[in-house]
């Protein structure tokens, strides 16, 4: 189990390489943003963020 991922997945392995489906996912291997309103390059989004409406901004990515 990936210590940076708090979500339990099949096989005890983190499978958020393509998309994060759990709010608490902190996988370092997550290539896409865990937050739909954040750009893929924002590393902070894997630590959790709050989207502000339908805008492309969120609490951790300005």
UniProtKB/Swiss-Prot annotation:
Residues 31-62 are annotated as: Alpha. SUPFAM superfamilies: Metallothionein (SSF57868). The modification N-acetylmethionine is found at residue 1. This is Metallothionein-2C. GO terms for cellular component: cytoplasm; nucleus. A divalent metal cation 4 binds at residues 34-35, 45, 49. Class I metallothioneins contain 2 metal-binding domains: four divalent ions are chelated within cluster A of the alpha domain and are coordinated via cysteinyl thiolate bridges to 11 cysteine ligands. Cluster B, the corresponding region within the beta domain, can ligate three divalent ions to 9 cysteines.
